[in-house]
A protein has these predicted regions:
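A sequence-composition feature that detects small, non-aromatic residues
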Residues: 10, 29, 48, 81-84
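Residues that form generic nucleotide/phosphate-binding pockets
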Residues: 16, 20, 62, 84-87
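Short terminal alpha-helical segments
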Residues: 1-39, 96-109
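Intrinsic-disorder-associated interaction segments
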Residues: 3-6, 10, 48, 52-55, ...
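Amphipathic alpha-helical binding modules
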Residues: 66-109
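Generic hydrophobic segment detector
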Residues: 12, 52-61, 81-82, 103-108
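Amphipathic alpha-helical interaction modules
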Residues: 24-72
Length: 109
């Protein structure tokens, strides 16, 4: 996948998740956190002219934090929002994880 295509696809999937999420928000703290994560990540993607590691790190931060909110937090998604999240989850594992470059000490087990 080309750099610009990856940014475009990520923006499209996150915009879709954001749009669907608007219908199931309950105003709880985790809902607000997810909305802030979506807003900041979408802003960074819109500013991005080319794909670099900082964009990939932003996507990874969004992914990790949202996974925690969905898995361990009090965030409740309806079926449509959960499907939109699973679509982004699949995209993230197929196109972001293997391109992300880690620096510093990394321990593999």
């Amino acid at each position: 996948m080309e750099d610009k295509e990856l940014i475009t696809n990520a923006t499209q999937l996150l915009s879709e998740l954001n749009k669907i999420f608007q219908s199931c928000k309950q105003g709880m703290a985790d809902d607000i956190r997810l909305q802030e994560l979506l807003n900041t990540t979408l802003q960074e993607l819109k500013k991005a002219e080319k794909l670099d590691n900082s964009i990939l790190i932003d996507l990874e931060k969004f992914y990790q934090r949202t996974s925690l909110l969905i898995g361990l937090g009090s965030l409740k998604l309806n079926d449509q929002a959960r499907t939109a999240w699973r679509n982004y989850d699949k995209f993230h594992y197929e196109h972001v994880k293997h391109v992300l470059t880690l620096y510093g000490p990394v321990f593999g087990f």
